Amino acid sequence: MENLVEKLKKAKESTYILSLLNTNEKNEALRAIANNIEKNIDKIIKENEKDIKRGEEKGLSKAILDRILLNEKRLKDIVKSIEDVIKLPDPVGEIVSMQKRPNGILVGQMRVPIGVIAIIYEARPNVTVDATILALKSGNAIVLRGSSDALNSNIILTNIMKEALSNTKIPQDAVQIIESPEHSVVEELLQMTDYIDVAIPRGSAKFIKHVMNISKVPVIETGAGNNHIYVEEDADFEMARKIIINAKVQRPSVCNAIEKLLVHKNIAEEFLPVIVKDLREYNVEIRGCEKTLKIVKDAIPATEEDWYTEYLDYIIAIKVVDSIDEAIAHINKYNTKHSEAIITKDYHKALKFLRMVDAAAVYVNASTRFTDGGEFGLGAEIGISTQKLHARGPMGLKELTTTKYVIFGEGQIRE
């Protein structure tokens, strides 16, 4: 197996070539990748089936197997997301601001690539493509280290992308994959400050915290999704039912699904039996606080641990609250700062929720399932940042750049 340092050196060297490419040259390379993926769908599915079979033998949950799965529809969606990124404006080289100083010099900021991005992710082979496409379009090299549960899928996708780059201006070395399943390789990777400019972990909260604790490389935290919907006493019941079902059961294994439901006490007796019936039609397990248990008598008592847990499964915990203030306090205590929603007709309550809830994305009368790069018009995302510095929310092209000061003069010297 190729030495880790050699791979990182090649990635670093490729960034100098990437920095000189224009938008058309980068888009042509992305188009070649999209075409090669589309041409090799059957081959990708065959390799993905190996991962699924091995996962079933290991006893992986349905939720994790769903994350690993690549079928024709999902692969065509990946191709479409590449086409969407091609259409997006290239942020590299954009002058963010320019001002003339009293001495005549022009001082501005220019968007430039970050450099080498390492993405460390669990069982989501689509991330292999999404991360690569966004990195290359924004002028960055990418180092991919996916989960061993999706290793065959990740390798075939990487090989197909590198093959596509062979006849383009983007060097193949700009895409590197770390195939070793050993955890020690991740720890070694995260010490490589000479070669890696930023690391982006994607996975469980425990996994992300582990990466942040051991890394010397700067890390952008992409949080787990312990997301809530709060139903205010004035909410439209039909709207609330539709949003809750979509946010919980459409794809429970993703980070923008909801895990908790908060309901105002004044509507709990009327609303809870209805929404619980809806949820149980999809075999969702109901857990609840003491007040919930008085209304939904066969619900499972929720523990303190439940309020912190991202289930990624057909499970939901319900809490009855006395007020919007209690709802906000509960959310800010237990959430992962990902996506939160309120269902209400009251503009002032909606505004209060928007201002006071600490999350990367806060919704009024809409499903949290929209927290996604494609849905936000970013084409795709390399991750959803839940921290407050550099980037917050879905990270697209702009978030994979930084700025440098550029200064134009006509011979000025400092007096």
UniProtKB/Swiss-Prot annotation:
It is an enzyme of class 1 (oxidoreductase). It comes from Dictyoglomus thermophilum (strain ATCC 35947 / DSM 3960 / H-6-12). One of its GO terms (biological process) is L-proline biosynthetic process. Keywords: Amino-acid biosynthesis, Cytoplasm, NADP, Oxidoreductase, Proline biosynthesis. Its EC number is 1.2.1.41. The keyword Amino-acid biosynthesis applies. Pathway: Amino-acid biosynthesis; L-proline biosynthesis; L-glutamate 5-semialdehyde from L-glutamate: step 2/2. This is Gamma-glutamyl phosphate reductase. GO terms for molecular function: glutamate-5-semialdehyde dehydrogenase activity; NADP binding. One of its GO terms (cellular component) is cytoplasm. HAMAP family: ProA (MF_00412). InterPro entries: Ald_DH/histidinol_DH, Ald_DH_C, Ald_DH_N, Aldehyde_DH_dom, G-glutamylP_reductase_CS, Glu-5-SA_DH, GPR_dom. Catalyzes the NADPH-dependent reduction of L-glutamate 5-phosphate into L-glutamate 5-semialdehyde and phosphate. The product spontaneously undergoes cyclization to form 1-pyrroline-5-carboxylate. Pfam families: Aldedh (PF00171).
